[in-house]
Design a protein with these regions (language model features):
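Active-site neighborhood of phospho(di)ester-bond hydrolases with catalytic His/Asp-centered motifs
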Residues: 74-77, 106-113, 160-166, 195-197, ...
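Short acidic low-complexity segments
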Residues: 194-204
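Acidic, histidine-bearing metal-coordination/catalytic regions of metal-dependent phosphoesterases
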Residues: 1-74, 79
């Protein structure tokens, strides 16, 4: 799904199942929720579409007049439902920042792929429309994954902020309700703070600056290429490294990326942006312990001081 969205921002794509790999109405629905504006043109197969980035959703958490401090935990790529998912490692890091029934961080940001999803190409939208038994089988898999994660997260009363990854979109491609929407309902029914943004990229205003969280569409594996740097260059070229909220500009100072499955922190001095890749909770990929604590304060010149 995400690579198809990325492809459609670069060139027109025929609006057919064969070319998109998914049902056109689902593709357009997801594109709209992710802040894209479709531009349609005639094509020999009917209609083609090219996506224009209209806006990235912006969420105000708190501005500099409320606090110039920040204190949050970055996570991504839990992959609950994967045979090698490590629930003990997830509980370990959540409990580290939770003492005596109180969180030690203001927010927990999770940048997609909370669930393993459906990783086989066997299922299709049409199949599930026509075959109730197969549809129920996929729904059961989704519900098992959702409930497994629910049983972990509900123990820790954090303020969770989460987005989709490519694995969650696997369910939407099949025409099913977004699993993280279901998880949000279940968490809130238990009185927990859990906010799901039905997109793969969202901006948060924190202490007078912007934190951009996204699940990378794809990444370049060539030696010497840092995928997050490459993405920042594209952001800079296509609109700048700042966001506007209610007429006020906020510089991007934090950039959290999911999808890469390796833990890394990078500070880019040229843009003054801290990049975090929180790692994966798949046992065979945990060279370094996943999760990154981001704590400090913002100076008057919008520079970041990490503690």
């Amino acid at each position: 799904m995400l690579r198809t969205l990325e492809k459609a921002t670069q060139k027109s794509v025929p609006l057919t199942v064969e070319d998109l790999g998914i049902e056109p109405h689902i593709f357009l629905d997801v594109a709209e929720k992710c802040g894209y504006q479709p531009v349609f043109t005639p094509h020999q197969k009917g209609t083609s579409v090219k996506l224009k980035k209209a806006n990235i959703p912006v969420v105000m958490l708190y501005d500099a007049n409320e606090s110039k401090s920040f204190n949050f935990l970055d996570l991504s790529d839990l992959h609950v439902g994967h045979p090698k998912f490590d629930p003990r490692e997830l509980e370990k890091i959540l409990s580290r920042y939770y003492r005596n029934g109180k969180p030690l961080v203001d927010y927990v940001f999770i940048a997609g792929d909370l669930l393993e999803g459906i990783t086989t190409d066997y299922y299709t939208y049409k199949m599930l429309e026509e075959n109730k038994e197969e549809r129920n089988r996929v729904i059961n898999t989704r519900n098992i994954q959702v409930n497994q994660l629910l049983n972990i997260l509900e123990k820790y009363d954090f303020d969770y902020r989460v987005i989709n990854g490519n694995h969650e979109y696997g369910y939407e491609i099949l025409g099913l309700e977004p699993p993280l929407r279901i998880l949000e309902r279940k968490m809130r029914a238990k009185g927990k703070r859990f906010t799901f943004y039905d997109t793969y990229m969202v901006d948060f205003i924190i202490a007078g600056v912007c934190k951009r969280m996204m699940h990378l569409e794809s990444f370049d594996m060539r030696p010497g290429v840092i995928p997050t740097y490459d993405r920042l260059r594209k952001f800079k070229k296509n609109g700048g490294l700042w966001v506007r909220y209610k007429g006020k500009k906020y510089p991007i100072r934090f950039f959290q990326c999911g999808h890469l499955h390796h833990r890394q922190e990078v500070y880019d001095g040229s843009t003054k942006i801290f990049i975090t890749q929180p790692g994966s909770f798949v046992k065979t990929e945990m060279v370094y312990a996943p999760g990154i604590l981001v704590r400090g304060r913002i100076l008057d010149n919008k520079s970041v001081i990490r503690e």
